[in-house]
Structure formats: C-alpha cells, structure tokens
Design a protein with these regions (language model features):
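Primary mode marks residue(s) on the alpha4-beta5-alpha5 output face of response regulator receiver
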Residues: 34-187
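Short, hydrophobic alpha-helical membrane anchors of single-pass surface/secreted proteins
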Residues: 12-16
Length: 187
C-alpha cells in the first residue's frame, strides 16, 4: 500500500470538466512553518519554474479551465487556472506536481504564474486512501461540495501562492494582489 499523499503518475480517464478546479481558503501558516515549510516551498518553486512560460505548461498537459476567477467583495482574485486532467484524475497529492497552475492575466495579454493549486476528487481520494483528509505542504486540503460554481462533484483543494505574495496568507483561496482585469474580465 502506498503512503497517503504519494503519487504514481498514471493517466486516468477523467471527465473534461473535472480536470481543473478550484479553491477555497484556509489559514494554517503556523502549522506550515512548524513543518519546515520553506524548504518544501523552494522545492515547489523549482518544480514549477518552467511553467512561467505558459507554452511549457501547455506542453506538459495543462490547459485553461473556467474563467479568471475574481471576487467582488474586495478579497482579490484566484486568477486563471490551468489544469492537468491526468493529475486531477490521480487521487494522490504530490507537492512537486500540482494539479493546477494559477496565472494572473496582464494588461499586455500575457499570463504571469502566481501560484499553484492542489486538487483531488473526493470519491477518488477516499477509494484510494480512505476518509483521512488529504494534506499538502503540511496543510489540510479544504473540502468543496458538489453544486459548486465549477459544476464538479465533491473535491478537495488548496491554493499555494508561491510566486506572488498574498496579504491574506500563503494558502488562502483569494489573493488581494491578483486581478483578472488584465484579460477584460470585470474586476
């Protein structure tokens, strides 16, 4: 039996809509720091550095999902998500292989990598690992119920703003320093 949270990268058929998703906030910075989080973050940055080039992300199997997600209550934005369906279809969570790359649209039409998101479908996770809550980087993933804005079944998610500081916290869903205005979406 594989330890919880390890991934064997094997393709699985996944409903196209499932291959992306989302995010909801949680603050656990104290637990993260206690777990030696900075070296883990450095590893995630190294593993995702090539994806500053969106074409490299696309070549690696990531693609745009949903619209750039902006919050009207002043919380900021989640940005534009590029999802890797094969990784979403694998229930394991591997910090070095995030299921989602998060980009901020820039005024010139380019995209700037600002973070990553970890996503697993609840049904796949529980089938493989049981009812324990998945974790990544020492932080629990947040459960998101079916009936969500993305039209997905129950899933777990966690954002990590590794490329753009977030005044709301490293693992909050919303980043008040990120905007969707660069691509014409309403602010």
């Amino acid at each position: 039996m594989r330890p919880i949270g390890t991934r064997t990268l094997r393709p699985r058929s996944v409903i196209a809509a499932i291959s992306a998703l989302l995010f909801v906030p949680i603050l656990a910075v104290g637990a993260f720091a206690a777990a030696g989080g900075q070296s883990q973050l450095d590893g995630v940055r190294q593993a995702t550095a090539a994806f500053h080039d969106v074409d490299a992300a696309i070549a690696a199997g990531y693609g745009p999902f949903y619209v750039c997600t902006d919050e009207n209550g002043g919380a900021g934005a989640m940005g534009q998500h590029y999802v890797n369906g094969d990784l979403v279809g694998d229930p394991a969570i591997d910090p070095l292989h995030p299921e989602v790359l998060v980009y901020e649209p820039m005024p010139d039409g380019s995209l700037r990598l600002v973070g990553v998101e970890y996503v697993t479908l609840r049904s796949l996770w529980e089938q493989e690992f049981g009812s324990a809550t998945p974790t990544v980087l020492g932080i629990d993933l947040k459960p998101i119920a079916a009936g969500n804005r993305y039209g997905l079944p129950d899933f777990y998610e966690r954002h990590a703003w590794i490329w753009r500081p977030n005044p709301r916290g490293m693992f909050d869903d919303w980043n008040s320093k990120v905007s969707c205005r660069g691509n014409g979406d309403p602010a």
